Every structure is written in structure tokens, then in C-alpha cells.
UniProtKB/Swiss-Prot annotation:
InterPro entries attached to this UniProt entry: Frog_antimicrobial_propeptide (IPR004275)
Residue numbers covered by the propeptide annotation in the UniProt entry: 23-53
Major location (coarse): secreted
Any Pfam family: FSAP_sig_propep
Places the protein is found: Secreted
Region of interest (Disordered), residue spans: 24-61
Protein known as: Tryptophyllin-1
Cellular component GO terms, alphabetical: extracellular region
Function description: The synthetic peptide inhibits bradykinin-induced relaxation of rat tail artery smooth muscle, and also has anti-proliferative effects on the human prostate cancer cell lines LNCaP, PC3 and DU145.
Length: 61
């Protein structure tokens, strides 16, 4: 019975450790994707501002 308790405890402990590692990786992936989305949005906003500031390539006379 003692061996069964130890093995069950070990299995639960290892399961919790693996879940915590997966959660950390998921958070890091989410952070990286959020950063790339923010950079993309900033780049898009900058290009939209540039489009507004530039006159059209042709000007009607």
C-alpha cells in the first residue's frame, strides 16, 4: 500500500510539473504573438499616416 501511495504521489507531482511548464510556454507564446500584433498595428498606423500626408501622384489641372 505504501508503494502505491508513493507512485500515485509521484505521478500527480510529475503531472502538475508538466502542466505548469505547458502553461508557461503558452503564456510566452501569447506574449510573443501580442507583441508581433502590436508591432504590425503600429506599422500599419504609420503607413496609413504616410498615405494621408502624401499628395496623390497626379494633380488635376
Amino acid at each position: 500500500m505504501d508503494i502505491l501511495k508513493k507512485s500515485l504521489f509521484l505521478a500527480l507531482f510529475l503531472g502538475l510539473v508538466s502542466i505548469s511548464f505547458c502553461d508557461e510556454e503558452k503564456r510566452q507564446d501569447d506574449d510573443e504573438s501580442n507583441e508581433s500584433e502590436e508591432k504590425k498595428e503600429i506599422h500599419e498606423e504609420g503607413s496609413q499616416e504616410e498615405r494621408r500626408e502624401k499628395p496623390p501622384p497626379w494633380v488635376p489641372v
